[in-house]
Every structure is written in structure tokens, then in C-alpha cells.
A protein has these predicted regions:
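Broad gene-expression machinery/nucleic-acid interaction feature
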Residues: 3, 30, 60
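Generic anion/oxyanion-binding catalytic loop in active/binding sites
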Residues: 8, 39, 62, 66
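Compact, glycine-rich, soluble single-domain proteins
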Residues: 9-48, 52-57
Length: 90
């Protein structure tokens, strides 16, 4: 099991569009993946679960993965968060 924290810096946090990119990326991996915020943990492959966390700009999440490709999964999802889900910061 692998865990890593990440802080959302995109303008609107984890709303519908970034959450969709996030779960699409998470679903590329075989590992079980969760997102945790404020002691609440949801399946990272579930759009409703991820949206229900209500993560806003500056919010910190913990990514947790368990499985054969856990390292790759965490690295890919952290990269997605750190690059603002491909959104411009205008």
C-alpha cells in the first residue's frame, strides 16, 4: 500500500471536469485507489465519490493505492493534480 498527499492548486478545485479526468486516469490502473480528505475516504474510480469530497482550491487530499501498479497509479494521479488537470490558470 502506498500513500501520498497532494494539494489542489487549480482555480476551482475538484469539480466535475477535473474529477472526470481524475477518475478516467485512476481507471487505467488495476490497483485499488482511494482519495481521502478530512478522514473521509472514497473510491478514486467513482465520480460521485470523488465529487462528494468537495475539494476546493488549496484543499489537501491523500491518495492511497494498493496493488501491482500502485506506484505508477500514485505517480500518475499526483502528476495530474500538480499540473492542474490540464487547466490553464487564467
Amino acid at each position: 500500500m502506498l500513500m501520498k498527499r497532494a494539494t489542489l492548486t487549480n482555480q476551482v478545485g475538484l469539480h466535475a471536469r477535473p474529477a472526470t479526468f481524475f477518475i478516467q486516469r485512476a481507471n487505467e490502473f488495476k490497483s485499488s485507489i482511494w482519495v481521502e480528505r478530512d478522514d473521509r475516504k472514497v473510491n478514486a474510480k467513482s465520480l460521485l465519490g470523488v465529487l462528494s469530497l468537495g475539494v476546493v482550491k488549496g484543499g489537501e487530499i491523500t491518495l492511497i493505492a494498493d496493488g501491482d501498479d500502485e506506484e505508477e497509479a500514485i505517480a500518475a494521479l499526483v502528476h495530474l493534480v500538480e499540473t492542474n488537470f490540464g487547466e490553464s490558470e487564467s
